[in-house]
Amino acid sequence: SSVANLEGRVMRYPRMDKEVLATYSKGVIASSGCPSGIIQTRLRLGQFDEALRAAGEFQDIFGKDNFFIELMDHGLPIETQVTGDLLTIAKKLNAPLLATNDSHYVHAEDAGAQDAMLCINSGSRLDDPDRFKFDGTGYYIKTAEEMRELFKDHPDACDNTLVIAERCNVMFDDHEDGAFMPKFPCP
């Protein structure tokens, strides 16, 4: 992500191409991504073959055991529209499923505070009908039970979150200042 932030910004968003991904792919576990990612975007545009090809390329880059087809459900039409195709891609590539949740706040009752923060960030008001806001619901850290209920038709997608957790073995050295971020020179 450092390369994406330092060298790959497109507008204000960090991005990296597949060559950079391949360079740093060793030991990385990846998923197909959210609705704004290339795979789901291609599916929404009716370009199934291109979505399948992109998923296959990611699987080649990260390895068959390290690339997961990601399922999300916030009640958004753009998510439900592509779920069937994502399942088909997973089957065609023999890729495991992964249940994820886009989390922007800790508890469900924090949604109002998040909404207010979005208004502060964009300089708009809560009563502005045209302001930026999240569509759908459930952008908080869900419990295992909530996720299993949401993805009850695909329990393996929830199981795979545990498979990934068990595979992650990261140790951080103690730092004097408590920070684990790289130090970048200030201009």
Labelled PLM ranges:
Residues 1-187:
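Phosphodiester-processing cores and adjacent nucleic acid-binding clamps
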